[in-house]
């Protein structure tokens, strides 16, 4: 399970991350990354605080992935894949980083190892050099 401090729950932050963040994709997922709470000043005060906390991840799994059971299993695998990448400590997330991971239909058939590799790769490529 993902710790509450790493969960992205605000609709405003979801939208802002998808609209203004960098997007990188793979065969199984698309990752949107908004670094350092960029644009947080335009949010209401309670959300500004959330936008500057350390990496928060939201998940989008559409009906194109499969039925409810398939979507739920896929979201659990992706959430765990993100947690694995986070726990590795190899990626240095700047304060206020928000990520939205969108599952593609192929993610339902992918193994956990594939998902970890794709999530790690997309996050690495999305960060500015």
Please state what every model-predicted region is.
Residues 1-129:
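Positively charged, solvent-exposed patches that mediate nucleic-acid binding
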């Amino acid at each position: 399970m993902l710790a509450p401090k790493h969960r992205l729950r605000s609709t405003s932050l979801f939208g802002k991350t998808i609209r203004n963040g960098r997007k990188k994709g793979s065969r199984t997922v698309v990752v949107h990354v908004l670094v350092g709470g960029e644009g947080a000043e335009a949010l209401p005060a309670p959300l500004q605080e959330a936008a500057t906390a350390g990496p928060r991840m939201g998940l989008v799994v559409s009906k194109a992935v499969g039925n409810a059971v398939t979507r739920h299993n896929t979201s659990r695998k992706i959430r765990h894949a993100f947690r694995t990448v986070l726990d590795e400590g190899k990626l240095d997330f700047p304060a206020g980083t928000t990520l939205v991971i969108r599952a593609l239909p192929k993610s339902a058939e992918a193994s956990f190892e594939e998902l970890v590799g794709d999530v790690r790769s997309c996050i690495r490529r999305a960060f500015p050099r």
